[in-house]
Each structure stands twice: as structure tokens, then as C-alpha cells.
Amino acid sequence: MDYVDFFKKDHFAMDAGIELKEAKPGYAVACVNVIEKHLNAGGVVQGGLLFTLADLAIAAAANAHGLLAFSIQSDIRFLSSGYLNDILTATATEILLHKTVCHYID
């Protein structure tokens, strides 16, 4: 199965302009070009876009194992801001694969 094509059905991420560049078991890369609709009132990227970008990368890495997977917990720390015309990239890397739970760093 081509997981990049599969995740084109993620309408929320696609409507946000997020593109899945690569997906294989335990690893995925997603990108977004920041446009005006992604900015909050302060002129920086809305945190929801950043979370959605990371979530798509993690979902692709987890689901590329061939079983339908869902996240049970996520948290994010914003280390810097994104701005208009930036290209933002999220890379999900599996750090632990267990029978029922996987852990990813993004």
C-alpha cells in the first residue's frame, strides 16, 4: 500500500495544505508552506497547524506498519515560531514499537 496516497484522504490535514512527503514503517515526513490563513492574530503560525503537521507525520509512521493505528496521547512544546512563507517540516521517528503501543519523537 502507498501510505502517502492513503493519507491524502486525511481531509483536515489536506485542507490545511499539509503534504505527506514520505511514509514507511516507523518513519514519516510531512511539510506545509505557511500561508496567510495559517497565521494567528499575532502574525505567527497558529499552534493548531503545528500540531496537525506533527500528528499527520506520526499517524503515517505508525500506520505504515500495515495496521490501523490511532494516537492515545500527544503533547507538544513550541520551541520557535513559524511565519508567513516559511516551509515547516515534521519528521516522525519511531523510538519504541510494542505489541499494542508505539512511541514516536517528532
Task: Give the ranges of each region predicted by the language model.
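Terminal targeting signals and extreme-terminal segments of soluble enzymes
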Residues: 1-105
